[in-house]
């Protein structure tokens, strides 16, 4: 009679999961995350800076290290990012190759002038500021990376938060859903996600 070992097949194990909250500075990511499901650890450079009283650069480096460690240990985690560079998109691609289930909540506005005004307001109320030129540059770069996010993630929700949060797009595995609003027509959403 064959012996049974303590090994469990991968089919019976739950995949590790990443939840990513992404979008340009001033879009309202942090506001929306208060109401959303997260998986601990929740890795957010702003929170790291606040807790550790360190610089923006040190907080960003520590957040990156924490994400990479979680990935190398096949642990589930949540993180928040502007996602205006390929670095975190590449991290998600690597996670996908390792078998992670990836869920993204992407928050944007219809115009970067809204983001600029929100960041100025946040800074006036004691929050962290971001130079205007960086907001504009990151906004454009972040939106340009949305098709890559849609491709790599299993589930994607895109919310227009120009006034109040309104879901304009959802991807579930291989299904796509569109909800136009006054700022985003269906054709504009399709152009945004490159479908």
What are these regions (language model features)?
Residues 7-15, 70-71:
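Phosphate-binding P-loop
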Residues 28:
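Conserved glycine(s) of the Walker
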Residues 18-20:
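Short hydrophobic/aromatic beta-strand immediately N-terminal to the Walker A/P-loop
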Residues 148-195:
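NTP-dependent small-molecule kinase module
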Residues 31-77:
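Conserved substrate/cofactor phosphate-moiety recognition/catalytic segment
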Residues 1-7:
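N-terminal pre-Walker A segment at the start of P-loop NTPase domains
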Residues 24-25:
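The conserved Walker
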């Amino acid at each position: 009679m064959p012996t049974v070992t303590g090994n469990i097949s991968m089919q019976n194990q739950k995949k590790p999961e990443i939840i990513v909250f992404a979008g340009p500075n001033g879009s309202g990511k942090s506001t929306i995350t208060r109401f959303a499901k997260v998986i601990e650890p929740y890795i957010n450079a702003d929170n790291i800076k606040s807790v550790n009283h360190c610089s923006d650069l040190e907080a960003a480096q520590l957040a990156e290290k924490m994400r990479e460690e979680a990935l190398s240990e096949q642990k589930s985690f949540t993180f928040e990012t502007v996602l205006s560079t390929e670095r975190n998109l590449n991290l998600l691609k690597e996670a996908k190759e390792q078998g992670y289930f990836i869920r993204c909540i992407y928050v944007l506005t219809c115009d970067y002038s809204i983001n600029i005004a929100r960041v100025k307001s946040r800074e006036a109320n004691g929050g962290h500021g971001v130079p205007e030129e960086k907001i504009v540059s990151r906004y454009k770069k972040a939106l340009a990376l949305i098709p890559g996010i849609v491709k790599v993630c299993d589930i994607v929700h895109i919310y227009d938060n120009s006034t109040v949060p309104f879901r304009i797009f959802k991807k579930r595995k291989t299904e796509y859903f569109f909800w136009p609003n006054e700022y985003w027509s269906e054709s504009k959403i399709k152009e945004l996600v490159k479908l």
